[in-house]
Amino acid sequence: MILETIGQLLIKVREENPLVHNITNVVVTNFTANGLLALGASPVMAYAKQEVADMAKIAGALVLNIGTLNEHEIEAMLIAGKSANQHGVPVLFDPVGAGATSYRTETSQRLAQELDLAFIRGNAAEVANVIGERWEIKGVDAKEAGGDVEDLARAAAKKLRTIVAITGKVDVISDGEKTYSIHNGHPILTKVTGTGCLLTSVMGAFAAIAKDKLIAGAAALVCYGVAAQLAAEKAAEVGPGSFQIEFLNALHNLTAEDVRRLGYIEKRE
């Protein structure tokens, strides 16, 4: 039943072509824009503090990503986020590398405190550090660490009063009450930079068109993971360069039937 709903949301994204405003990092800007276009959304990358408030209020969703943060982008994120909050636009936050440095951790916590976030998406270490728990970080990627990811997602969602998606070998998304685990995707995603960042923006596209934000987030995770599996069938053995191309193709060609056939989502207690 839920896979049927997810397939319908995929169709709706393409029908409505939502505008997703990204204040993201320099490493992933091109990949993020092309990924959103391939899916059927409309990306805009606007960073200047003089215009971000106006852009955010007309967007379907606002995505904030601190991968290559600096003081100018932080200011722009706060301006855009407050504008989005005032106009009912969902704000999604990707706390890239939270825990790697005090600057990243403090910035992540500040954004989470000062803005009304609809979603936070990160790996387990990033999410843990946003709520003040220590998980081991290497660069901006989390090592395998102890702790129950489902419990962490629930706790973070309750503490931050938002929907939290923790992605890894198994993806988990929770609003603090309802929790889903998603068992799609492919390991080669970790060999292409920006796949997590694009995922947050894809979640923005789904959040823009769905009333039930938790299901919207789960839908994005399932669709993204299924597209990765389809791309990996064609290119995983060739390498990450070919996979990146096939992944964009898979996002573009993904169907509701693919979702029903390959989607693997569980509701957790």
Swiss-Prot record:
Assigned protein family: Belongs to the Thz kinase family.
CDD domains: THZ_kinase
Protein name per UniProt: Hydroxyethylthiazole kinase
Binding positions (substrate): M45, G194
Any Gene Ontology biological process: thiamine diphosphate biosynthetic process
Entry-linked InterPro entries: Hyethyz_kinase, Ribokinase-like
Organism: Brevibacillus brevis (strain 47 / JCM 6285 / NBRC 100599)
Bilayer-crossing regions: none
Role summary: Catalyzes the phosphorylation of the hydroxyl group of 4-methyl-5-beta-hydroxyethylthiazole (THZ).
HAMAP family to which the protein is assigned, alphabetical: Thz_kinase (MF_00228)
EC number: 2.7.1.50
Domain of life according to the entry: Bacteria
Organism lineage string: Bacteria, Bacillati, Bacillota, Bacilli, Bacillales
Keyword terms, alphabetized: ATP-binding, Kinase, Magnesium, Metal-binding, Nucleotide-binding, Thiamine biosynthesis, Transferase
Pathway(s) served: Cofactor biosynthesis; thiamine diphosphate biosynthesis; 4-methyl-5-(2-phosphoethyl)-thiazole from 5-(2-hydroxyethyl)-4-methylthiazole: step 1/1
Required cofactor(s): Mg(2+)
Pfam families per the UniProt record, alphabetical: HK
The protein's enzyme class: transferase
